């Protein structure tokens, strides 16, 4: 792409796929993404020896949503713990689904195709933002949870683009003109 600035200087802008893009979870993120996959490392570091149920239960206890006794008494499964987290006033929570077929793509849109495909997709983890995390990074808001959900969706989408190889880099070079020269500037002929 050839560009010209206000002073007539010409530039060449080259945009190309970045095959060595950095994992976006190494950036400054607001949400926490935890996944359990055998073939991929997706999201933030966490103890993979814990099951998804253990991680959800810990999150419920740490955020005063449920006690260990309540969880054992009600014999709650992952989906019930996720529902308790979604209904909480102090945490924004989203499931993460993956579709794996000649590559992988992830989304928080769990109920839509292809993320609800019965053979090649399934829940691989979850993302969350606590009210405390949100207020620390974004300030106090009455609609903090709605905004935190948007942040989760956006950060998961960014990770998905990285997984799918949709990362680009650019190089901006000043165009060099050789005027009125009788010799080649490279070989001097």
Positions of predicted regions on the chain:
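Acidic interaction surfaces
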Residues: 1-189
């Amino acid at each position: 792409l050839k560009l010209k600035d206000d002073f007539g200087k010409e530039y060449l802008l080259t945009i190309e796929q970045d095959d060595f893009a950095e994992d976006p979870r190494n950036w400054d993120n607001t949400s926490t993404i935890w996944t359990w996959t055998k073939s991929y490392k997706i999201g933030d570091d966490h103890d993979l020896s814990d099951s998804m149920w253990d991680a959800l239960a810990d999150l419920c206890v740490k955020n005063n949503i449920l006690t260990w006794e309540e969880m054992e008494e009600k014999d709650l499964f992952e989906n019930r713990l996720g529902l308790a987290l979604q209904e909480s006033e102090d945490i924004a929570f989203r499931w993460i689904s993956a579709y794996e077929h000649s590559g992988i793509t992830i989304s928080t849109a769990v109920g839509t195709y292809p993320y609800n495909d019965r053979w090649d997709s399934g829940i691989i983890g979850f993302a969350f933002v606590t009210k405390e995390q949100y207020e620390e990074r974004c300030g106090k808001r009455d609609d903090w949870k709605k905004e935190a959900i948007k942040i989760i969706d956006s950060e998961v989408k960014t990770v998905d683009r990285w997984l799918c190889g949709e990362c680009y880099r650019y190089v901006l070079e000043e165009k060099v003109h050789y005027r009125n020269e009788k010799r080649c500037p490279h070989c001097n002929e």
